[in-house]
C-alpha cells in the first residue's frame, strides 16, 4: 500500500477505536455531564415506560377528584377537570423529548449537508447556499412557525412542528461547518482523494464528515435543549402542540394562572422542563470538553484539580 493510498483511506480502525475510548474516558471523568446523561436517560425511559403502568390515562377524567393536591391516588394531584397531573406530565415530557431530539437530528443533518457541500464545491453553489442561509436568518421564523404549525390536526401538527423548527434551526451550524470544510478541503488527504478520482459525495462522506463528527455531535446535543425551549415557547402561546395532546409548554401555560393557589399544576411541568434543558446542556458541555481537551472549561477543571493537592499541603 502506497503512502497516498494510506492518506486517502484515513486513519486505521484501531487508532479510531482508541480515540473513541479516550473521548469516552474524558467524558466519564466529567461528573456533571455523567449525572446529566443519567438523568436524561431516566426521564426518557420514564416518559415511555411509566404511562402504561399508571391507573389513569392522561385524558381520563376523575370527577371525584377535581383540583386535588398530590396524594397516593394522584401523586402529582389533579387539574380542574380531574385529569391526573402525573400522567399529563409524563405525556408532555414524552412529546417534548420527541420534538427536541427530532428537531436536533433534522437540523444537524441539514447543516452537515449544506455546510459541507458549500465549503467543498465553492463557486456559485457556495454563493447560493449562503444566500439561502442569510435569507432564512433574517426571516421571522417564530412568526412563520406560529402561523403554520397549528393548521395541522392530531399527530400531523407535531410532525409539522418538527419540520418547521428543524427547517429554521440549521443555518448557524451550516456556517460553522462550511468554515471547517473550507479548511479541510486544502488538506493532503482531500487533495489525494481528488487526484485518485473520488467523487464529491465520496469526499464529503468519507473525509469531510468524519473529521467534523465531533462538532456535529456537540451541536446536536446542545440543539436538543434549544428545540425543547422553542417548542415550549410556541406551546405556551398556543401555537405548538394542539389539544387534546399535551406538552410541557401547554401544561405550563394552563397552570400559570393558578401557580400560587394550585402550584402542583405548574411546578412539576416547569421542573421537568428546567431539568431536561439543564441535563442536555451539561451533556453537551461534557462532550465538548471530551472532544476538545484544550477548551477553556477543560483547562480550568484541570487547574482546579491541580490546585487541590497544593491547598491540602499548605493546610
Description of each model-found segment:
Residues 16, 59, 78, 121-124, ...:
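Residue-level signature of the cytosolic catalytic core of signaling kinases
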Residues 21, 83-98, 102, 122-130, ...:
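Amphipathic cytosolic juxtamembrane alpha-helices at the membrane-cytosol interface
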Residues 51-59, 120-127, 153-154, 177, ...:
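Transmembrane helix-loop junctions in multipass membrane proteins, especially transporters and channels
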Residues 75, 109-111, 119-187, 215-218:
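Generic hydrophobic transmembrane alpha-helix motif, especially the helices
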Residues 1-112, 116, 138, 142, ...:
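Gly/Trp-centered helix-boundary motif
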Residues 34, 95, 125-126, 141, ...:
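Residue-level recognition of membrane-helix boundary sites in multi-pass small-molecule transporters
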Residues 44, 48, 116-120, 147-151, ...:
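Alpha-helical transmembrane segments of multipass membrane proteins
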Residues 137, 148-152, 165, 180-181, ...:
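Glycine-rich helix-loop "coupling/hinge" segments at transmembrane-helix boundaries
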